[in-house]
């Protein structure tokens, strides 16, 4: 069976893994998923990520907890295959008043909403993480 939205699947696996207090979650790997995992690690939402080089590459994300509670409170897909959401540099959202991040796909690559504002670029809003 083919997957219609692999990014939504990735976010759902992270959400479900943290709800069940799993140490890590595994999923099929892709360049965009690895870029999202890198941003989540840089922003402190996950502990680590690794790509296993096999016949079918697999991405493993080590989840992060603080005092027994998941660090990621909400993780939500915004732009989806059926309805793409694009925002200009002045329209980029601030998630939870700046406490969370919006992951934006720009012409300069994947970055957070803060980095996109600093670079003066807009793009496709992939997801919100708080």
Curated annotation (Swiss-Prot):
This protein's UniProt keywords: Ribonucleoprotein, Ribosomal protein, RNA-binding, rRNA-binding
Disulphide bridges, residue numbers: none
InterPro entries, sorted: Ribosomal_uS8, Ribosomal_uS8_CS, Ribosomal_uS8_sf
A GO biological process held by the record: translation
Pfam families: Ribosomal_S8
GO cellular component: ribonucleoprotein complex; ribosome
PANTHER family per UniProt: 40S RIBOSOMAL PROTEIN S15A
Self-association and partners: Part of the 30S ribosomal subunit. Contacts proteins S5 and S12.
Family membership: Belongs to the universal ribosomal protein uS8 family.
Name of the protein described by the UniProt record: Small ribosomal subunit protein uS8
Gene: rpsH
């Amino acid at each position: 069976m083919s997957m219609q939205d692999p990014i939504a699947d990735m976010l759902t696996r992270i959400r479900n893994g943290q709800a069940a207090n799993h140490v890590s979650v595994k999923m099929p790997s892709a360049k965009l998923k690895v870029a999202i995992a890198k941003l989540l690690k840089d922003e402190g939402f996950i502990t680590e990520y690794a790509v296993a080089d096999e016949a079918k590459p697999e991405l493993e994300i080590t989840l992060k907890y603080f005092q027994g509670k998941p660090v990621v409170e909400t993780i939500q897909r915004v732009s989806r295959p059926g309805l793409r959401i694009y925002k200009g540099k002045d329209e980029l959202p601030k998630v939870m008043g700046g406490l969370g991040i919006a992951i934006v796909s720009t012409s300069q690559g994947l970055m957070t909403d803060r980095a996109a504002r600093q670079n003066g670029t807009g793009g496709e809003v992939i997801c919100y993480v708080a």
